Amino acid sequence: SNLFLRDLVMALRWVRDNIGAFGGDPANVTIFGESAGAHAVATLLAVPAAEGLFAQAICESPASGLVSGPETAAKIADKFATLLGAGADNGAETLMQARPRDLVDALDTLLARSLTEMDGAFSLGPTYGDELLPEDPVAAMRAGAAHKVPLIVGTNADEGRLFTRFMKLLPTTEPAIERLLSGADPQARERITAAYPGYPRADACVALGGDFAFGTAAWQIAEAHTAHAPTYVYRYDYAPRTLHWSGLGATHATELLAVFDIYRTRFGSALTAAMDRRSALTVSRDLQARWRGFSRTGVPGDDWPRYTDSERPVLVFDRRTRVEYDPHAHRRTAWEGFSLASR
């Protein structure tokens, strides 16, 4: 089980054993990922076999609802096998004989049903309860059982907007949100929807869906990890005018434009054609400098306070980068206690 996690651990061991040949320090490796990759990074924090294989971690927009317990994982596996045409007695045989195209088609169908057939987790992700991943990663962080390395975690201001145009996997419409909340306590439903003024107006639904998919994970990870290790939280608000005009804004994955210096490319020049190039490059330089500094020292800048439960400082990347304290507190607290597994 959890074969992708085993692959990641093997890759990190290779890095440890070989990074010196490239001038690197095996004792100072930083891992970082975005979206499902950020979730993988957070999960590795709770993998005992990854002990000592990395010194810092960065989670950009970690996805929520991907971790399954054994019972939920079994339900998802049964559905997957059924889509492949397996019966009660030949699941393993059917799986081994399936063509790659059949596996992809079955997985696509399973993912498409995720919003209507919530089983306690989305259909892709790790399963806890074995020697590789003994417990839910956030639970391990809360208990102090995860790796106590410095962590950066954060989200983007308009996470959900991407999923109204592409990859329509998130609950960003009223019917999808009501299905999501249908198994929750009625008070929880009222509390969550009230945190998004104007619900069920479209913009409120999109903000709610984005928080469910990414905000909840970032908040939970930050709160759990900061009790035992240095934790820094950010929100990425910057978007050039072209992205605002398109209706996407600072949506999911747009921070990668800054991380990977895309604004210096032809594509980046097109995105910043509306007199935004200087601000885009400024934001990029700032973010990259902080990521580099963190990767070297575990500290992303003296002006970025460590996250605490009492003050909850968040560094906001924008035309004017600044620190805000517990932004969107009403949205954060509205989701407390809610999870797919508890529905």
Task: Describe each region flagged by the PLM.
Residues F22-E34:
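Alpha/beta-hydrolase fold nucleophile elbow
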Residues D17, E51, Q56, E60-R179, ...:
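Substrate-access "cap/lid" subdomains that shape
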Residues S1-N2, A63-S68, Y128, P137-V138, ...:
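Active-site rim elements
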Residues S1-G20, D78-K79:
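Alpha/beta-hydrolase active-site loop
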Residues A146-T193, P240, R278-T282, D286-Q288, ...:
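C-terminal, loop-rich substrate-recognition/catalytic regions characterized by aromatic stacking residues
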Residues A38-A50:
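Short glycine-enriched nucleophile-adjacent loop
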Residues G183-A217, A222-T226, Y232-Y238:
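Alpha/beta-hydrolase fold catalytic core
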Residues T216-R343:
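Mobile gating loops/cap/lid regions near enzyme active sites that modulate substrate access
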